[in-house]
Amino acid sequence: MHNITFFEVTEPKEAYRSAVNNLLTQLSQNAKPMTIDEMTYMATCNESHLFFLCIDNKIIGMSTLAVYRSPIGCKVWIEDVVVDKDYRGQGLGRALIEKTIKEAKRFAPCSLLLTSRPSRIEANALYQSIGFWKRETNVYKMDII
């Protein structure tokens, strides 16, 4: 039996940055590599919380909680959810999301949100099976350079 662990990154380490960059390439072909400065910021700031899912001390998945307050309340976004391609189909994505939701509850009351491309059929089915519902809205993006 494998030892499965889940933890929040609270200090920058090169091994963590390397794991993030490996997983990012599997999440999006447009992702740029994370720098050690970005890792340091994420590990120490209050609004971003990076989590790793490990099997036998090997990082095989990650998720991020982005937390902010607006006039209508606290919002928590789940971002960058990915399980290493070699470990998919074993229920680890569900475990990762469920553990991330548990962490989000420390910010309650809040709205917990996430986005997922329509082409990610399995991921969308997973999110709905856990209790998320599809919200009819438009999400817009602008790159500010």
PLM features: residue spans?
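Active-site rim helix/loop that mediates acceptor-substrate recognition in acyltransferases
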Residues: Q29-L50
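A conserved beta-turn-beta hairpin within the catalytic core of GNAT-like acetyltransferases
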Residues: Y68-I78, R88, W133-R135
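Conserved acetyl-CoA-binding loop-helix of GNAT-fold acetyltransferases
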Residues: V83, G89-K102, A125, S129
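Conserved active-site alpha-helix within GNAT-family acetyltransferase domains
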Residues: R94, P118-E136, K141-M142
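Conserved N-terminal entry element of GNAT/NAT acetyltransferase domains
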Residues: M1-S18
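Conserved beta-strand in the GNAT
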Residues: F52, K58-V67, W77, V82
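Active-site beta-strand termini and strand-to-loop segments that position acidic
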Residues: C54-D56, M142-I144
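Conserved GNAT acetyl-CoA-binding A-motif
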Residues: I97, A104-S116
